[in-house]
């Protein structure tokens, strides 16, 4: 592994040298040094006040490099280094103290040098199809000052101000190490918690994000300012650190008590789903927190529909903005900020503290023993429940400390909430070895460096896809994780049965027939609700698909939205050329293809790792679609042709409605017959006891493959119907919140229950699309016009709490019934 990493860095470095040295091999005449030559640094802003930083390098009266950065929507800086070293033929000349040039398709730069030490200018930036958090069109007015180099003797040789290939490589490494250190900070808590319960905590990302929000809120509440005496600043920040660690520990212990303790020893998937429900609830807490703050920017939450604002208060910059290379008069043309060194040092300090705690303290030794297995730990007298609780408290405290360092480094909180936000931290924890803090640090730094190298030498828009692909490779290569083979949680009940609602024979069939008749009659009685009901029936189809995988086979597919969205995109591109029957077949095949990939993963991974792997697969497919120009990027594809069959276009809303209803009825009937068949009984036997089913002749890998292929095929058919009948597709169809909504529908209706799929999907969609809007309108009419009472409460904004509590309570109540 070490040799592979070393060879990777060497190859990338040689590629960088070959691509940047070649232009300079052309002989050129030496030119006299210009008074404008040197490093320039300045700031600017857009018309709406968005701050930018600008760095220029001038050599021989030519612009040889330009770098700019700004804060993205999630609070993390976006840095454009693509033009940090321009090829010789692309370097614009400064004529009459001015230059204007299109450095690329996404950047137009102009500048006027008022003197030899001051310049102003304008940047026109088109940042698209890279990181969505950075995307946008920006018009930036900036001003910059020339950086005065350290005084040298006249006899010293004059050094070029342009960075050479080696310096460029080192600069990228520094960016990567600082970003990787931030990732490693979050991974420390992940690895400590996971080592005891061996199930991913999907709410950990929300704990970390809320701790960063607490840090910025408390700093602003106390009013800590840069002009305070140093000891007073240090004392105030130390108090904030203690509060952040306390909040992190408290939230993390709460997650353990509510999401892990009730299911201990019974199921792997139940706590995973429960933490997803708590992720919804914690995000709702972030929204409530926001209402008490005076400023914020749009944030992200990947687990729920919509992207409302989350707490993102800015704070003063307490870390000195100095370049240590210039301050120490080092002979290198690179930038090493004090803040970069600070975050790397603090990551090392926290990792060392965690390693010392695990090796020297009684609790740490108990956690290490527990990571090897619960039964062995109990045999040597360890209190399992108490040790797990302490591990969560420790992991939460480290999440609070990491949140404190993150907020100081970026001067604002982490803006990405939800289950996805902790995914890359889990990659670092898995790569470094579960329960190994130093491994989490090294892998976090490695991921940061690989990301920076990919941003510069490849393309930034593919970096997230590269990291997600890395996670998939890690899972298939080392299914049990690196550095830990212990099984801390032993399941005694099959994963799907704990989520299954009790069936009642003929009563269930009667309800199923009643629902189909009602869906067929409602458009004739009330045509106005056809669009909402058609939307609900598409989600019924998706719920039927996930029901096959989760409710019957016990495999949680958190990437089912990828099959849905990919088939929708294929339909949008080809529906005008093929009839609806052909497109339904193609959509099913597209979904089935992703099902084959999931089936391969299922053959190598246990249930909870499989869930995380499918989550990563869904995000990977979405990122690839965003990066493809013909797919429309973030804007999607509109104006999709209406479905047609035998030269008859189904243009009317009623025609589209009954088309979807017929497909849903056929899918429900087929699903019911399949579950009752020999194949369905084999799936149920497999999920109840894999070893017993295998001894009876059930092919484990083949059975899971068939289940996941059929599940994804149904999702593909749903995607085709969505694109054909709603005439628009977008990347958010493949977003994680769609998979989460489908999961909620399955759990609410009862996993393994065809009628439950109808009930769950109809309940969620009608609540979200019909009941809540009407209730909000009614509340606005009756709400008193009284300033003391306040404005009308936004009950639509409470949807996240409602989804989370439904998901959590349904899993909890059914788990208790099974016990």
Can you annotate each of these PLM segments?
Residues 166-167, 191-200, 221-226, 231-238, ...:
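Short, hydrophobic transmembrane alpha-helix segments
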Residues 13-16:
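C-terminal motif of bacterial Sec signal peptides marking the signal peptidase cleavage site
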Residues 205, 239, 265-319, 324-327, ...:
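Transmembrane alpha-helices and adjacent helix-loop boundaries
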Residues 181-188, 378, 383-406, 419, ...:
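Transmembrane alpha-helices
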Residues 23-29, 36, 82-93, 120-154:
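Edge beta-strand at a domain terminus
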Residues 18-20:
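Bacterial signal peptide processing site
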Residues 46-94, 120-122:
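N-terminal glycine/threonine-rich, aromatic-flanked beta-hairpin/loop signature
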Residues 245-250, 275-292, 340, 352-353, ...:
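Mid-bilayer segments of alpha-helical transmembrane spans in multi-pass integral membrane proteins
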């Amino acid at each position: 592994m070490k040799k592979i990493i070393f060879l990777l860095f060497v190859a990338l470095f040689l590629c960088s040298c070959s691509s940047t040295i070649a232009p300079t091999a052309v002989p050129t005449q030496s030119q006299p040094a210009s008074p404008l030559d040197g490093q320039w640094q300045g700031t600017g802003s857009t018309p709406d006040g968005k701050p930018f930083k600008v760095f220029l390098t001038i050599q021989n009266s030519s612009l040889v490099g330009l770098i700019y950065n700004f804060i993205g929507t999630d609070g993390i800086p976006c840095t454009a280094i693509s033009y940090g070293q321009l090829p010789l033929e692309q370097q614009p000349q400064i004529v009459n103290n001015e230059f204007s040039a299109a450095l690329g398709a996404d950047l137009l730069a102009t500048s006027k040098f008022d003197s030899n030490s001051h310049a102003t200018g304008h940047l026109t930036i088109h940042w698209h199809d890279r990181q969505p958090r950075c995307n946008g069109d920006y018009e930036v007015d900036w001003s910059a000052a020339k950086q005065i180099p350290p005084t040298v003797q006249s006899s010293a040789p004059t050094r070029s101000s342009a960075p050479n290939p080696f310096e460029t490589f080192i600069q990228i490494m520094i960016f990567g190490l600082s970003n990787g250190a931030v990732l490693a900070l979050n991974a420390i808590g992940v690895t400590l918690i996971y080592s005891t319960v061996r199930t991913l905590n999907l709410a950990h990302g929300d704990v970390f994000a809320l701790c960063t929000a607490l840090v910025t809120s408390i700093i602003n509440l106390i009013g800590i300012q840069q002009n305070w005496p140093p000891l007073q600043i240090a004392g105030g920040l130390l108090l904030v650190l203690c509060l952040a660690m306390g909040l992190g520990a408290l939230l993390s212990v709460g997650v353990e008590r509510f999401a892990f303790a009730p299911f201990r020893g019974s199921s792997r998937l139940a706590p995973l789903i429960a933490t997803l429900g708590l992720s919804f609830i914690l995000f709702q807490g972030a929204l409530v927190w926001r209402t008490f703050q005076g400023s914020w920017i749009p944030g992200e939450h990947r687990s729920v529909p919509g992207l409302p604002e989350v707490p993102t208060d800015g704070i003063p910059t307490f870390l000195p903005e100095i370049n240590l290379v210039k301050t120490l008069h080092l002979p290198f043309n690179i930038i090493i900020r004090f803040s970069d060194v600070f975050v790397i040092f603090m990551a090392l300090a926290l990792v060392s503290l965690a390693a010392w705690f695990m090796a020297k303290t009684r609790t740490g030794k108990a956690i290490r023993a527990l990571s090897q297995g619960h039964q062995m730990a109990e045999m040597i007298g360890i209190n399992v429940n108490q040790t797990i609780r302490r591990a969560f408290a420790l992991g939460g405290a480290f999440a609070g400390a990491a949140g404190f360092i993150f907020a100081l480094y970026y001067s604002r909180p982490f803006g990405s909430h939800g289950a996805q936000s902790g995914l890359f931290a889990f990659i670092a924890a898995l790569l470094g070895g579960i329960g190994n803090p130093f491994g989490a640090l090294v892998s976090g730094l490695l991921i940061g460096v690989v990301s920076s190298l990919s941003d510069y030498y490849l393309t930034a828009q593919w970096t997230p896809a590269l990291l997600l692909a890395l996670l998939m490779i890690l899972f298939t290569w080392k299914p049990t994780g690196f550095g830990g083979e212990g099984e801390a949680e032993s399941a005694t009940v099959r994963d799907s049965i704990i989520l299954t609602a009790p069936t009642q024979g003929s009563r269930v069939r009667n309800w199923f027939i009643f629902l189909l008749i009602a869906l067929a009659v409602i458009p004739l009685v009330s045509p106005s609700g056809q669009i909402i009901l058609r939307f609900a029936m598409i989600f019924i189809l998706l719920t039927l698909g996930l029901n096959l995988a989760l409710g019957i086979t016990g495999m949680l597919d958190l990437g089912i939205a990828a099959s849905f969205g990919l088939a929708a995109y294929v339909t949008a591109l080809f529906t005008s050329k093929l009839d609806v029957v052909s497109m339904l077949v193609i959509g099913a095949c597209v979904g089935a293809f992703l099902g084959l990939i999931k089936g391969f993963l299922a053959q190598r991974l246990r249930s909870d790792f499989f869930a995380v792997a499918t989550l990563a697969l869904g995000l990977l497919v979405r990122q690839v679609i965003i990066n493809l120009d013909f797919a429309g990027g973030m804007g999607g594809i509109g104006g999709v042709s209406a479905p047609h069959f035998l030269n008859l276009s189904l243009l009317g809303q009623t025609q589209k409605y009954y088309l979807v209803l017929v497909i849903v009825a056929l899918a429900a009937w087929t699903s019911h017959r399949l579950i009752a068949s020999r194949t369905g009984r084999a799936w149920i036997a497999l999920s109840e006891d894999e070893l017993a089913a295998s001894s009876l002749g059930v092919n484990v890998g083949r059975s899971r493959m068939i289940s996941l292929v059929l599940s994804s095929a149904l999702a593909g058919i749903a995607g085709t119907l969505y694109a054909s009948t709603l005439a628009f597709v977008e990347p958010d169809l493949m977003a994680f919140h769609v998979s989460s909504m489908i999961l909620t529908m399955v759990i609410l209706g009862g996993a393994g229950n065809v009628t439950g799929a109808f009930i769950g999907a109809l309940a969620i969609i009608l609540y979200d699309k019909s009941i809540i809007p009407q209730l909000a309108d009614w509340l606005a009419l009756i709400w008193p016009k009284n300033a003391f009472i306040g404005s009308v409460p936004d009950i639509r904004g409470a949807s996240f709490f409602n989804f989370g509590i439904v998901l959590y309570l349904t899993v909890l109540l059914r788990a208790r019934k099974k016990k």
